[in-house]
Amino acid sequence: VRGLGTLKLNSTKEYVEKYTEEFYLVDLYYRRTLEAYHELITKENPIEQTLSDAKRQLDLEYAKITNVLNLEWLTCVEEKGAWFTETGLKRQEDFYKNESDTSVKQVVIVCDALRYEVAKELMQELAKEKHIATIDAYQAMLPTETKYCKSALLPHHSLELNGTDMMVDGTLLTTTEQRTAHLGKYREGAICTRYEDVMNGDAQSMRELFKRPLVYIFYDTIDEAGHSQSPFEVISACRKAIEQLTVLVKRLHATWNVTNVLLTADHGFLYTYEEFREDDKVAQEGF
């Protein structure tokens, strides 16, 4: 943390570049340290109190640096005004347009709440298997919620709000069947499915599934853990996601003959082991 240098930068683009290159490590190391801490305290340990004290100090240090970084970011946003167009990032709603390739068979894995630092670790795991793995950042839609952002990852001509619902080409897409019907309008034979159905499917049906030109697989493990009352559930779910998605990508390549795999997220998440207080929140006026 002390090696990060200044947290006050001159533009939103600089913040994005700095986060994707270096600042993300603060989130990654915090998560990994909590993971190690939980493994130690679940066993009888003579230094449990010492570990607990060290972990408490870690929580305070993490909260401090993320709070300072967030305040500097918000100051930059307020000063720049039209910050949303100046980050240098591709936009989430253009994902299909940017990444779709009709010349090859593709699988898109949409991982709910896969934040950037977890994706970086996943990429490192995939690289161990001699995959050619690269990572790129996209700018999520606001508000960054599943019901808005997940729909934006599908092909579309229009995205419109109807009350609090996101309409895709004038239609509400909340089920796998609805998403499949919609996807098929843009790519004949394309289909949407769930991770559980893929991993639990029989060999013959999976071979047939991945003969299709485009398959969207929806994976929800991290987001589901975020609704738990246990603060460690999210940390555990991140590790589970890295392991399960590594296995899935390996099977796609080796068993189902899919060479072009895209893995993306609808949104990320904010996390601290300590509970958020009211004074941790920022008023939404002006955003």
Each PLM stretch: what is its role?
Residues 1-287:
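Feature captures the catalytic ectodomains and active-site-proximal regions of enzymes
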